[in-house]
Amino acid sequence: MMKKILLTILILFLTQAETTAQILPKMWRRAKNQEVLQPKDALRTIDTIIYIARKRKEYGDLLRAELRRRQIILKLSQDSTILAIDSLKKEEREARGKDAVIQAIYSTILATLSVNDTTPYARMALERPELLQRIRVKPKTYRAITNEEFSGKYFNYDLLSIVGLILGNYDLLAERYIQAGNREAMFLIAFEKIRQQLPEKSQEAD
């Protein structure tokens, strides 16, 4: 309880002293420096990023932080992973009917994990594609999430392309960008769909 109070005080101090544009890059650098030798400290830093991102509706940073948190926890222990999945499920349930973007983000994370239930998280994550298509992600955040495999400018740095690519729903993405008249995005999606169907060795040769 005391740790949560101290974390909240720290966050309030940071949010008053600096703008989000200043805080989040600084927190990301701190998390990166901590991750190898101090993974638990890195998790605390990422929890702070998650709090700030949700508060300021920085959806790209929220998705990036939850993905990073998942990767660190998977390396720590099986017990930590189980607890993390339960926490993600709780966040997704609480977002239902309140914030469709938050729900889509947590559904996306859960769809990438073995959650041992029949909830169709991948489908739920893309139930509101038109909404995700309107959400813009900062270019640097877009590159970090996609590992710079795609140039976000062709997708207008929208959240839909990130979620769709993570989940591999190329047909839905193609449909949305055809409707939007975005030929560049349509061709990139078609190319990625073909690339993913190639044998692994062929992909490595690329």
Predicted region positions:
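N-terminal secretory signal peptides that target proteins for export/translocation
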Residues: 1-2
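Boundary at the C-terminal end of the N-terminal hydrophobic targeting segment
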Residues: 19-21
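Extracytoplasmic/secretory-pathway proteins
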Residues: 24-30, 38-206
